[in-house]
Amino acid sequence: MEFVDLIQSRRSVRGYSAAIPHDDLVALLTRAQQAPSWKNLQASRCYAVESPEALAALRVQGLPSFNQNSSTGATLVVTTYVRDLVGFTQGQPDNEVGNGWGAYDLGLHDAYLVLAAADMGYDTLIMGIRDAEVIRKLLDIPENEAIMSVIAVGKRAEAPAPRPRKPLDEVTRFI
């Protein structure tokens, strides 16, 4: 698929008929690792949840009901970044953004993940409304990692309609 077609056709899917198989998940996460990062520090981390028991616990305990329903049938990938690494030198922030750079790099990683999934024929839903501390305990995520999102990955049950985009002149200023 051409890249322009890929970015224009990718949708957030809220209903899944099948999870991504393990080997495809490994390939997907390997592709997501190719995302650029500050000084190549690669502070993004993934927790791929595949077992039925872990998926059920994560959905019921870590997600609100609307996200539980939206992600049923999919594999879940929790994405985090290592705090105080990206955008820091000798423990001090390089500028006012500080840990925002870790979140920025993770955003790049997650964009690569969802676009690579689409290229592989899978659909995704990035969920930011979640209970981070419950997820931390369930998946044994270290305290030095900031939990950002839970991403559902699988085959869509039905095709969602395209969502409108704001006009370019509303979000861009040419100088």
Spans of model-derived segments:
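C-terminal helix-cap and adjacent tail motif
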Residues: 3-12, 17, 90, 149-175
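A short beta-loop-alpha structural element at the N-terminal edge
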Residues: 17-23
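Short beta->alpha linker loops
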Residues: 20, 50-53, 130
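A structural motif
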Residues: 25-33
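Small-aliphatic-rich amphipathic alpha-helix that forms the alpha element of a beta-alpha
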Residues: 32-33, 77, 94-138
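Glycine/small-residue-rich phosphate/adenosyl-binding loop
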Residues: 37-106
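A glycine-rich helix N-cap at a beta->alpha junction
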Residues: 67-76, 140-162
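Short secondary-structure boundary segments
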Residues: 81, 129, 155
